[in-house]
Amino acid sequence: MTSYPRIAIIGAGPAGLTLARILHQGGVKTTVFEREEHALARPQGGTLDLHVESGQLALRHAGLYEEFLQIARYEDQGSRLYDKNGTLLFADDEADESDRPEVDRTALREILLASLPADIIRWNHDLREVCPRDDGAYDLFFEHGTAGPFDLVVGADGSWSKVRPLVSHYRPQYSGISFIEFGIDDVDASHPELAALVGRGKISVEADGRGMIVQRNGNAHIRGYAIFRVPADWANKAFDFASPASARAQLAAEFEGWAPKILALIHASNDHIVSRPIYALPVGHRWQNRIGITLLGDAAHVMSPFGGEGVNAAMLDAAELGRQLLENDDWRNAVRAYEAEMFERVMEPAEHAAEAVATELSHLGAELSLQHYKAHLEARHSTAA
């Protein structure tokens, strides 16, 4: 392409930054607008596994695979399943042979940010509205000021995207599942017994219509999610989040009767206890192409986290849009080609995520999880053979 559009990317998450990096490598100028005040303004979330065919592929396209290897935790891919009495039902502690290593979200963001000139990103820009102009371009209106014009506005601004309404009237719907997030700091030194319980990876516990996933992160941190099938506003009514001590006690009370070593994970948690209701767009969400507007990642296809595809799909979106823009003679056709491919590509992971959230906390308890873990282990062994 000899003439590139003026490109605004809304959101400095993995998708937005991956797109900016790939285009920067190709000599295409972009501007990334991020509502956070700076890179460390808030925690970026827990750990995630990057898949060879999506997240890792995107980092290869971005020229950051070696940097990825420096932050990849191949040793933290184990899985254990316990019942509420603390009995170990399944263990796969040799998963470091898998090709989907764990990566902390903050570390991933750091390598992406380090690969870009600082002046590409405009921090503290909270988008309020995208307004079309008479000449076909778009102006951006932020909480404090405006920017533009831009020929192409890419919404990489997450589940509650401010760009999405320009192409779609759909909004994410509550899945029926809510997480309560908690964490344990310096676990190896302060709580070695809990470090041993979790091991090098994650544990799952499910019984009595509720569950818990607890996972090792980097820097000796453990992050946990208590899982409930409840109304969307349940957590804010049931917990006093303004008082971490109260919230911690209330959370432990929800698991009364469970093994002390499981409850100890909650009792040892720090003061960062928050509600995370799970929302998703309809499976097959798509829109009619609108010149100058497109979406990446959760803005396009937010799905439940149970399939582990969210960030991976988002980064592959970025890689594919970047490739189309760099290879196509007409940027408008590039966007159309990206959207057509993306709509089909995300169908399968979205269906799997929807099925997973629908069956989470079923009457079968841990039985479905046990079947899943065994099938995953068998598939990995057959692939290795």
Describe the function of each predicted region:
Residues 40, 136-138, 205-206, 274-283:
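Short gly/ser/thr-rich secondary-structure transition/capping motifs
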Residues 2-10, 22-24, 49-187, 235-236, ...:
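Conserved N-terminal helical subregion
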Residues 336-337, 345-385:
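Alpha-helical, largely C-terminal catalytic domains
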